[in-house]
UniProtKB/Swiss-Prot annotation:
Name under which the protein is recorded: Triosephosphate isomerase
Binding site for substrate: 10, 12
Enzyme superclass (EC): isomerase
PROSITE patterns: TIM_1, TIM_2
Gene giving rise to this polypeptide: TPI
Length: 251
């Protein structure tokens, strides 16, 4: 089975006006995008519905976070049921900024993943190691630990609705990027773990994408790797070069 290429744009807490957010999507709507690449953008929560309304057929929308409860006294949270009801197909979970700034554990990420799937959402599941963990040779172990909590919550058939985003924490927003071989090696390790922990079928069919200072200059080389199925892009998704990243596999 050929895994379709996937490029997501995580806007984080940007831009600071709805007009600017709409302009980003309108530019994508007009762009010549590779039709074989699945394109998803994740605007701030306030902009989800207006962006969903104007996004063309080639652009899907993702929430940046969701809670693991469907409703209740959880001030400030958004439930997966609400996201699904709004017609938003994707949600990003486990991003390193959520893990570090908001102290989300792998177990919490796993609960959120289960809740999102139960409500019909597709999940962009983020994993990745810190610079210290990489220097200690623990990259594979850290990624496996983060994945193992999710594996415990999922059935084999659930994985068809998961995209794994490997994002080394030391490369996010720093301008540093994992070398092509470093990224490919970790993606292979992720597949080896999935083959053992879930099944060879899931390991073969699950898309594993790379994130961490991806830009137009390095995207083609990264996209040429056998086990890199796309990108989760941060800052560059707010710039015109995002189109070039989407088209990284285009001849």
């Amino acid at each position: 089975m050929t895994r379709s290429f996937f490029v997501g744009g995580n806007w984080k807490l940007n831009p600071t006006s709805l007009s600017a957010a709409k302009a980003l999507v309108e530019a994508l709507n007009k762009a010549d995008l590779d039709p074989s690449t699945e394109v998803v953008v994740a605007p701030p929560a306030l902009y989800l519905l207006p962006i969903q309304e104007i996004a063309g057929k080639a652009v899907k929308v993702a929430a940046q976070n969701a809670y693991f409860k469907e409703s209740g006294a959880f001030t400030g949270e958004i439930s997966p049921k609400q996201i699904s009801d709004a017609g938003i197909p994707y949600v990003i979970l486990g991003h390193s900024e959520r893990r570090t700034l908001f102290h989300e554990t792998s177990e919490v990420v796993a609960l959120k993943t289960r809740a999102a799937l139960d409500n019909g959402l597709k999940v962009i599941l983020c994993i990745g190691e810190t610079l210290k963990e990489r220097e200690e040779g623990r990259t594979a172990a850290v990624c496996e630990e983060q994945l193992s909590a999710v594996v415990k919550q999922l059935k084999e058939e659930d994985w068809s609705n998961i995209v794994i985003a490997y994002e080394p924490v030391w490369a996010i927003g720093t301008g540093k990027v994992a070398t092509t071989s470093q990224a490919q090696e970790t993606h292979v390790d992720v597949r080896k773990y999935l083959a053992t922990a879930v099944s060879p079928k899931v390991a073969s069919e699950t898309r594993v994408i790379y994130g961490g200072s991806v830009n137009a200059a390095n995207s083609k080389d990264l996209a040429s790797q056998q086990d890199i199925d796309g990108f989760l892009v941060g800052g560059a998704s707010l710039k015109p070069e995002f189109v070039d990243i989407i088209n990284a596999r285009k001849a």
